[in-house]
Amino acid sequence: RVPVPLPLAACWQRRVLGYQAAIITQRIEKAQPIAQYIEKIPPESVAIVVKQMHDAGVWHADLNVFNLLIDAQQQIYVIDFDRARRFDVVDSKHRQNNLLRLRRSLIKVRGEIGQQWYEQFRRAYLQLAKA
């Protein structure tokens, strides 16, 4: 099970070239993007959530430090599944794509600290993949 905000309502409207959709989710009290707190967040806890998402067959189109939230209880949540895709199995290419997108985001927002944190996250993710 992937930790996400509880969906409350959704709608969609047909357009000439596709559709437009919206979803309203429950607010997660005191949740903040992980970008501001990576020094305090164990990379392993984020690796577990990202691995759960991939194991559930979900590929996130924009996995970045603003689409991973942490609440006051240190629970990690994934948000913004716009353009996400569902697969029977998320293959290694798509998994790697997600990890590299997160890496770019970490480096852009947090520089060297982001790079160091990502390396720990990646090691944890790969360890989980072996288990």
Predicted regions, residues:
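Conserved ATP-binding subdomain of kinase catalytic cores across diverse folds
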Residues: R1-Q32, K51-A56
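Glycine-rich, phosphate-binding/catalytic loops in enzymes
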Residues: P3, P42, H94-N97
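Short, glycine/acidic-enriched loop or turn micro-motifs at the edges of active sites
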Residues: E29, V65, R83
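AlphaC helix of the protein kinase catalytic domain
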Residues: A31-E39
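Conserved alphaE helix
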Residues: I41-Q52
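Conserved catalytic-loop position in the HRD/HxD motif
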Residues: G57, D62, D80
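Hydrophobic residue at the +6 position relative to the catalytic HRD Asp in the kinase catalytic loop
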Residues: L63-I70
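C-lobe/activation-segment region of protein kinase-like
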Residues: D71, I76-A131
